[in-house]
From Swiss-Prot:
Catalyzes the hydrolysis of phosphatidylcholine with phospholipase A1 activity. May act as an allergen and induce hemolytic activity. This is Phospholipase A1. Keywords: Allergen, Cytolysis, Disulfide bond, Hemolysis, Hydrolase, Lipid degradation, Lipid metabolism, Secreted. Belongs to the AB hydrolase superfamily. Lipase family. Its EC number is 3.1.1.32. Expressed by the venom gland.
Length: 301
């Protein structure tokens, strides 16, 4: 018995470009009908965005993130909608009990994204270097599983996977093969915002601990504000798409240096350009309680 069964038919994709911002659902079979795929080549950088438990591709946070990407650059954004396998349509009071079922579907959804990637590379000549994955919560692990699968398929690695507060329950004590991991892409960027729904464990090439990785400012009391802290990862990253070098991470230590002393050589900016900075490892990121959450007073490093 799985109340939230997975099949390839239950996963849909919303494909957005600057020219076509319609929220239509596509499948592996119908994606060829999208204007962007009428030709056999597409040169745009591609970004997959994948939601988490009991969410969907049309949830406001992901709609806002997709818009920020299209405002920023000439991207092709694919919002992966796996809501049925994520237990989104289940009875509210029972949803939490269904979490293990949604968690067990993550590898299958990751394999699906890898299959779409294979089609993009082989049928539409999209270079792997042009495909980046962003996932929130369970969607972060899905992105990691996609990263493992494309390597198995002989496609090489994605240039980057961005894990927004990867889900802790069912995953935090797993080894690399059973969760998002730094070997899943050439660069794996992790943003930690909740130590209960997420995990404090380092998982990536860079791990950003926003406000120490828990109890995000503006989210209210600990525990009660846990969902707010968990989803804040999506909002932080969206602001970092809009405002370059908005949130600066300082190397994690007992006495982190102030952001004002940062230089490009030892600190790293959260966001799409993080991988252009030389430093890797764990970083502490102070944040404000309201958007755009910036900690840099306009400083760009």
């Amino acid at each position: 018995f799985n109340p939230c069964p997975y099949s390839d038919d239950t996963v849909k994709m919303i494909v957005l470009t600057r020219e076509n911002k319609k929220y239509d659902f596509y499948t592996l079979d119908t994606i060829k009908n999208h204007n962007e795929f009428k030709d056999t080549i597409t040169l745009k950088p591609h970004v997959f965005i994948t939601h988490g438990f009991t969410s969907s591709a049309t949830a406001e946070n992901f709609v806002v993130m997709a818009k920020a990407l299209l405002d920023k650059g000439n991207y092709l954004v694919i919002l992966t909608d796996w809501r049925m396998a994520a237990c989104t349509n289940e009875i509210a009071g029972l949803k939490l009990a269904y979490y293990p079922y949604a968690a067990s579907n993550t590898r299958l959804v990751g394999n699906y994204i890898a299959t779409v990637t294979k089609m993009l590379v082989q049928k539409y000549n999209v270079p792997m270097a042009n495909i980046r994955l962003i996932g929130h919560s369970l969607g972060a692990h899905i992105s990691g599983f996609a990263g493992k699968k494309v390597q198995e398929l002989g496609l090489g690695k994605y240039p980057e996977i961005i894990g927004l507060d990867p889900a802790g329950p069912s995953f935090k004590s797993n080894d690399c093969s059973q969760r998002i991991c730094e070997t899943d892409a050439n660069y794996v960027q992790i943003i930690h915002t909740s130590n209960r729904l997420g995990t404090e464990r380092t998982l990536g090439t860079v791990d950003f601990y926003m406000n120490n990785g828990y109890n995000q400012p503006g989210c209210g009391l600990p525990i009660i504000g846990e969902t707010c802290s968990h989803t804040r990862a999506v909002k932080y990253f969206t602001e970092c798409i809009k405002h370059e070098c908005c949130l600066i991470g300082v190397p994690k230590s007992k006495n982190p240096q102030p952001v004002s002393k940062c230089t490009r050589n030892e600190c790293v900016c959260v966001g799409l350009n993080a991988k252009t900075y030389p430093k890797t490892g764990s970083f502490y990121v102070p944040v404000e309680s309201k958007a755009p959450y910036c900690n840099n007073k306009g400083k760009i490093i």
